């Protein structure tokens, strides 16, 4: 029966803890990279500061390294006015944009993977834009402000 060395076990545990604790750092050996951590995606341009802040937080929390990885975005009560630039995240499936100051939602028309969109409590959104969004995303569930449509 092989003899188990406690020192070897302890060294193994220390190595695992060290590597796990350094996942955010590049590891090199003789100046050659052994491990380089993935960088959070930042190649987007969103003009609205509230939306940019919300997207940045979602990218950090989800450890998103590519725009296609972002599938859920919750920006309710964020003060978002403009959605320009959100189309960069083409794989978004769920968006909560309720209780903001949105007027124009045309950027959502470029997000063909959307399955759930909450636009409630954004009273200034154009009803025609909501109708267009519902037509283009016929498989999606869209919660939108009540529109007074002519009879």
Task: Say what each PLM segment does.
Residues 80-83, 102:
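Fold-core signature of tandem repeat domains
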Residues 2-7, 11-13, 21-76, 85, ...:
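N-terminal capping/linker segments that flank leucine-rich repeat
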Residues 78, 100, 122-123:
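Conserved "Asn-ladder"/turn position within leucine-rich repeats
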Residues 101-107:
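Charged, surface-exposed interaction regions in soluble eukaryotic proteins
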Residues 83, 89, 111, 122:
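Acidic-histidine catalytic/liganding microenvironments
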Residues 112-127:
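Non-cytosolic head/periplasmic domains of membrane-anchored proteins
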Residues 72, 91-96, 116-118, 139-141:
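Conserved LRR concave beta-strand detector
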């Amino acid at each position: 029966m092989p003899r188990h060395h406690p020192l070897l076990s302890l060294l193994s545990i220390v190595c695992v803890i060290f590597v796990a604790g350094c996942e955010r750092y590049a590891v090199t050996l003789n100046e050659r990279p052994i491990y380089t951590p993935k960088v959070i995606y930042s190649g987007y341009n969103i003009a609205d500061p509230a939306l940019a802040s919300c997207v940045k937080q979602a990218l950090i929390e989800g450890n998103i390294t590519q725009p296609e990885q972002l599938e859920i975005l919750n920006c309710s009560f964020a003060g978002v006015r403009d959605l320009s630039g959100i189309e960069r995240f083409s794989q978004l499936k769920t968006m909560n944009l309720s209780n903001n100051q949105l007027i124009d939602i045309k950027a959502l028309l470029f997000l063909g993977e959307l399955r759930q969109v909450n636009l409630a409590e954004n009273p200034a959104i154009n009803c025609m834009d909501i109708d267009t969004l519902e037509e283009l995303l016929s498989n999606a569930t869209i919660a939108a402000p009540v529109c007074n449509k002519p009879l």
